[in-house]
Curated annotation (Swiss-Prot):
This is Probable thioesterase BOA10. Signal peptide: none annotated. InterPro entries: AB_hydrolase_fold, Thioesterase. Its EC number is 3.1.-.-. It is an enzyme of class 3 (hydrolase). It comes from Botryotinia fuckeliana (strain B05.10) (Noble rot fungus). Gene3D superfamilies: alpha/beta hydrolase. Induction: Expression of the botcinic acid clusters genes BOA1-13 and BOA17 is coregulated by BCG1 during both in vitro and in planta growth.
Length: 270
């Protein structure tokens, strides 16, 4: 499996646009991103590498961030990149941004959090209860071994999020600027699902993260899952292009490490 995979190739007139790397959701796949309209740039999708082999990350989200940062450096050697993801993918994007923080050749120009709930969930299960099983649909011709590995991947990603310690930025640094896209509706179930615990809060609770890095919240019709259905995809694609335009033009001053002088200097983002 190619990873990352080029989901959209930039049209000729957008060849110089900042590339976007979108990270997998809690299911480990990047399939939803294939349904988006053109985002006018190269769009790469990063899948969970153990989706089919049953492997795990020893260091959870932090381990994913380090590996995925390496993936990005393999595709873009220098310049600007944009990061983002739907649901769990947004949290992973923040960790990857932290892992790229001291890479002098690369600048994370911004992050898109696509309906990513703040990972501060209540303790809603007894401590000794077994891990939650997040069931996935049956794929035609899928072997029992493959399905078991895929189910294991889902559970591992969700567990990694539940114990993740969000990265901290020090010495005047902060996360790259982010645009949050929030679905307006709740998932139509009898009980409130986890993704809707902060549904009415700005940026689904991310104001609790003490860096004031979200520069804009955009809103789309639909719920957490339906935004990728045909009825809502045109609006979602439009909002994503709007978010990307905002980040493309956002001047951001940060502290980067000068590789030649081996000292910290304040410069404008490349």
């Amino acid at each position: 499996m190619e990873n990352p995979v080029l989901i959209q190739k930039a049209p000729r007139r957008y060849k110089s646009a900042i590339p976007l790397f979108l990270f997998h959701d809690g299911g480990g796949t990047v399939l939803p991103y294939y349904f988006l309209e053109s985002l006018n740039r190269n769009v790469w999708g990063v899948s969970y590498p153990h989706l089919n082999d049953g492997g795990t990350f020893e260091h959870g989200i932090k381990g994913m961030g380090e590996l995925y940062a390496g993936y990005i450096r393999g595709k873009v050697s220098r310049g600007k990149v944009l990061l983002g993801g739907w649901s769990a993918g947004g949290s992973i994007a923040i960790q990857v941004a932290k892992c790229l923080e001291n890479i002098p050749e690369l600048c994370v120009a911004g992050i898109i959090l696509l309906d990513t709930p703040f990972p501060d969930f209540p303790d809603w299960r007894p401590k000794n209860s077994p891990p939650v099983q997040f069931h996935i649909p049956v794929v035609p011709d899928q072997t029992a071994k493959s399905r078991l590995a895929q189910q294991q991947a889902v559970n591992d990603i969700i567990h990694a999020l539940s114990v993740w310690e969000l990265p901290t930025w020090e010495n005047g640094r902060r996360p790259p600027p982010a645009v949050f896209i929030r679905a307006l509706k709740v998932v139509p179930t009898e009980k409130v699902v986890e993704v809707d615990w902060f549904r009415e809060e700005y940026a689904l609770g991310w104001q609790k993260y003490p860096y004031n890095f979200i520069v804009e919240e955009l809103r789309v019709d639909g719920d957490h899952f339906s935004i990728f259905t045909p009825s809502y995809l045109p609006e979602l694609s439009t909002k994503l292009r709007e978010a990307l335009d905002l980040l493309d033009s956002k001047p951001e001053t940060g502290i980067l490490l000068d590789s030649k002088l081996n000292s910290s200097i304040v410069i404008s983002a490349l």
